[in-house]
Each structure stands twice: as structure tokens, then as C-alpha cells.
Amino acid sequence: MLNLVLMMIERVGLIVILGFLLSHIKTFRRLLHKQDGYVDKLKLICIFSVFTIVSNYTGIEIAGNTIMNENWLQGVSSSSTIANTRIMGVGISGLLGGPIVGIGVGSIAGIHRYMLGGTTALSCAISSILAGVITGYIGYIFKKYNRTITPKFSAILSVFIVSLEMIMILLIVEDGMSIVKTIAIPMILVNSFGSFILLSMIQAILRQEENAKALQTHKVLRIADKTLPYFRQGLTEESCKHVAQIIHRFPGTDAVSLTDTEKILAHVGLASDHHIPSHSLITGLSKEVLHTGQIMKAKSREVINCQHEGCPLQAAIVIPLTSHGNTIGTLKLYFKNPNQLSRVEEELAEGLAKIFSTQLELGEAELQSKLLQDAEIKALQAQINPHFLFNAINTVSALCRTDVEKARKLLLQLSVYFRCNLQGARQLLIPLEQELNHVQAYLSLEQARFPNKYEVKMYIEDELKTTLVPPFVLQLLVENALRHAFPKKQPVCEVEVHVFEKEGMVHFEVKDNGQGIEEERLEQLGKMVVSSKKGTGTALYNINERLIGLFGKETMLHIESELNEGTEITFVIPKKVGEEEQIVKSISS
């Protein structure tokens, strides 16, 4: 009996090794956590059936009290029986996979055992199927009530199931008592012990994975929580510096770097002497990620392709930062030892990049909301601005005495102007024709106040009037020209507005022949709010930020000016017709 126990323990070791190898396969672990439909259950049936078939083939053939064959079995003589660990695989499959998996594995194990033959072939086949049914429904009940199946419970259940198999042998096999006396105790001991070990090992590996994921999730969430206030400011050198410092404080990386599409925005850690913020990108890996938009990793200096000799960074993972589907920068985690770049670090970097991309999109949406609110406030202020309103009313009042029809038309233009203010304040994009109506209404009011002072010429391609543009853009540029471009005594004040299509882009030009802008002030306009006696430049800054936020940096304002010659403001936007709803959704998402 002792020899039989020792031999069967060897078979248990083989099954445990097989289970250990399978437990390190990601697909197998996922199937144990969750089975989505019958395909996943079929996969589990196939996997655990391998356990039971191996158990059958590695069983020990016994005739009476004599061990006949302890090698790989091809068949069993009609007078012999088998002592094996088949019940281990059937029991574990039912407990972890439920009734369908348990019955499936039990049936395959039973049929295979019956085909091997021997005096106990039928009783073992029936007991295998019963084992699958019993363990499957027990596993289902435990899962239904959210109870954990412990290895100890699995061992006790194995004692019961092997005992049931012994009862089947007594009922079906002639002279079953002698067989039971020989194999009962070894099979009960070894199968219960094997079930305990196998389930303990599988659960330990699953717990280890869950703990690693929990730790990683906690780490990512802590980093995300600390970096959120900075990414609300956008992808700037100042915000990226704080973000890189936060990530570097967490153990695991030797250096952290963030870039936009052109230059290094921040670098903290090793190699700070040549990975310098504001400098152009120096690694080929970063350029490739920006070009492809794909995650890339390197485990050698040659693959990183740093141009600086003696760079200590030997491994890296570079992840694209995206906004609305466009790659706008990269997050780079560097290591001085290639072995540090594990799968855990890769998943950490991927998780951070996704969260950072979301934070950048939220920050951009927040900025767009603020800019739209600013535009709305400006529009509302224009409605109740007493000077603007009084001047318009006084002009209409004066015309009532001399030209009633013109006064009536001017009142209509005033209503159009206010209506455009209200509509534009509630939308991100409007048809160009609506914006032109706004401009025309404003010009009618100004030209009525100052007859023959301003000459505004508009050259608009008719097919572009349905193109979607941000509200207040042209109106504010024209208003800005009339208010600030011309000295009081300039005799002829000319403004030209050109809108035309070129290479799939809509080009806008607003020119004047005014006094021009000083070079120092010209460099600041559109990029920041500038305090001066001539104005703050808020309108140009608002327009510029809205254009960049909606369409990207390539649509920013370009301002050219010469003193006493005039100023020209140009910008381009993609040609979009009838897509306002989709564009608004993409900006707000």
C-alpha cells in the first residue's frame, strides 16, 4: 500500500506541474476569472480534460495485490484495475468552471477511462460523470452566493467523491471488495492531497495577479490624482515638469520625460544633463512613436537611439499622448537596467498614458468651455453696453427726422446684431453666412454713426458660405480693426475681408490701411492679454485660443503689421460643411 501511495504522489506531482504551467498562461487565468459564453466553457473543458486524460494514462495498473504496470498505459487487461488521480482534474474543473464544465470534463474522463478497459472501467466511467455533476453544481452554488471555495473544502470533497467511486466498484464489479481494499485508501489520500495542492497553487497565482493589479491600479490612481491639476493647464513645460517629478517619486523608473511633437517639455532623473527641456527631440524612438502613434519599447541604447555619447539610459518605453485621436506628445519611462522594464512597468505606462490623454482632453474641453463663456459674456456685455446702445439709439433717433426708411432698416440691423450675439454665444460653430450677417449688422450701425468714414470691402467665395466657423471670429476682427487701427484724423479708413478656399483649407484675411502695430506689442498679440492704453488684446487672444483648441496649432492667428502702412491678420481652418453636431461632440467628449 505504501509503495502505491508513493507512486501515486509522483503522478500528483506531474498534474501539479501541468497546472502550474497553465496558471502562468494569461488566457487560462482569464477563463478561471470569467467565462463569457459557451466558447470559453468549451476551452475550459478541453484544458481540464487534458488533466484527466494524462491521469488515466499515468495510472498504475493493479491485479489483485500486485502492481502490474507503472509506466504509460496503452490499455488495461480485463482482470486488472487502475489506481489514478483522475478525480482531481474532474473535481477542480467542476468547482472552478460550474456544471457545464464539470459535466463535460467528467464525461470525457469517464469515456476515456472506459476505453482503456479493465474490471473497473464501467464503474470508474460512471463515477467520473457523477463527480463532474456534483462538483459542478457545488461550484455553481458557491459562485451564486459569492462564497470562496477553499483548498480544505476541495480536499474533503475529493474524499467524498473517491468514496463514491469505491461504492460504485462494490455495486458493479464482481469481487469488488478485494479491489477496494487495495486501492481505496491510497486513492482517497492522494486525490484529496492533490486537490488541496492544485487548488492552493492556482488560487495563489490568481491572488498574486490580483494583488499586483490592485497595487498597480492604486499607483496609477495616485499619480492621476496628483497630476490632474497640472494637466488641466495643458501640455506646457511648467505642467509637464510637475507631472514628471510626481511620476519619478514613485519607485520603478530611473528617469521620466514628457514631450510635445517637437521638443522635450520635461525630463527628471538620469541623463538630465543632455535631455534638456525646450531642446529638440534627441531620441529616434520618440520620433517614431510620434510618427506611428504606437507604443514602442527599447531594451538597449542602440534602439533608444539617443544622440548623446555615454547616455546611461539602457531601456525605455515610449507611449503616445493623444487628444481627440491625434498624437500630441509622448510619455517616456527610462531605465538604466533593461531587466527593470517588466510587463508590470509596461502596463503602468500604458495606464498612465490613457489617463493623461483623458486629462488633456478634459483640460482642453474645460478651456473651450471657458473661452465660450468669455465670448458669451462679451456678447451679453455688448447687448447691455450703455454707450453702444445709446449711440445706436441716438443714431436711429436722428435718422427718424431725416430718413424714416433708413431708420427702420437700421433698427432691423440692430435686432440682427443682438440676435447674432445671442445665437453665437450658445454655439461652438456656425455657418459662415451667419457670421457675415453679424459683421454686416455691426458695420451698418457703425457706418450710420460715422458716414463715409469706413470703407469695408468683402470678398467671399459663395460656395464657402455654408462652411462652419467659430462665432464672433470675423466680427471681432473687423470690430478690432475699426476701433484700434485708425487714428482719429485718418481721412480714408479701409478694411478688406477675404475668404477663399485653397488645398482643402478655408483661408481668412482681414486687412486695414491703419497706423500699424509696434513690433514689441505685435509679438505679444494673440498669445497673451496685454495691458496698454490702446486695449488689452483680449479679443485677439480669445480668437487665437479658440482656433487652436478647435482645430490645432496650424490654425492660429498670423499677424503682420508695418507702422503707418497697416495690419493684416490671417488664419486657416479645415473646410467643414454641415458637421457642427459631430464636431461639437468630439470637442466636448
Swiss-Prot record:
Subcellular location: Cell membrane
PROSITE patterns for this protein: HIS_KIN
Domain spans labelled Histidine kinase: 360-577
Phosphohistidine modification, residue list: 387
Keywords: ATP-binding, Cell membrane, Kinase, Membrane, Nucleotide-binding, Phosphoprotein, Transferase, Transmembrane, Transmembrane helix, Two-component regulatory system
Keyword Phosphoprotein included in the entry's annotation: yes
UniProt main location, coarse: membrane
Catalytic activity of the protein: ATP + protein L-histidine = ADP + protein N-phospho-L-histidine
Membrane topology: Multi-pass membrane protein
Residue ranges constituting the GAF domain according to the UniProt record: 235-360
Enzyme Commission number(s) of this protein: 2.7.13.3
Protein name (Swiss-Prot/TrEMBL): Sensor protein LytS
Lineage, opening ranks: Bacteria, Bacillati, Bacillota, Bacilli, Bacillales
Gene encoding the protein: lytS
